[in-house]
Amino acid sequence: MKFQTLTTEELEVCSGGVAMDPAAKWIMQHESGGSPTAGHLYAQGRGDGTKGNHSSAFGAFQMINSTRKQYMGKDYQSTDLGKQYSAATKYVDQRYGSWGKAENFWKAHHWY
C-alpha cells in the first residue's frame, strides 16, 4: 500500500489555513503516512494473504468508528483532512491535554 505524503502547505490548506501542530503531523505520519483515506493495516492484512483483525481505524489519524462518530457526528466517514484533524484534536485534547503529550504516549506505546 502506498500513502500520499502532503507538504506543510497542503496540510495547512486542508486544516483550514491553520498550521497543524508539529506533534499532530508526527502522529499522522506514523499512523497513516498522511493519507486521509488510509484504512488500518491490520484490517487490510499484510498483502500476503494474511487476514487482518478488522479494526475500524480509518483516516489520517486512524481513529476507530466509535471515536470518529463521537467527534465527527454524521461526518464520521469523511475523508476531509480538515475534519479529521479537527476531530482528532478534540479527542487528543480530551484524552491527553495536548498533541505533545499524545506524541509522547505514542512513542512509549506505539498507539495513542
Please report, for each region that a protein language model flagged, where it lies by residue.
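Generic structural signal for alpha-helix termini and adjacent loop/cap motifs
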Residues: 9, 17, 30, 94-95
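Extracellular/periplasmic catalytic domains that process cell-envelope and extracellular macromolecules
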Residues: 13, 18-21, 53-56
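N-terminal secretory leader/proregion of peptide precursors and effectors
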Residues: 1-17
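Active-site micro-motifs of SAM-dependent methyltransferase domains
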Residues: 13, 34, 70
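Short, functionally critical alpha-helical segments immediately adjacent to catalytic or ligand/cofactor-binding
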Residues: 20-45, 85-90, 103-107
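Catalytic and binding regions of secreted/periplasmic enzymes and modules that target cell-wall glycans
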Residues: 58-112
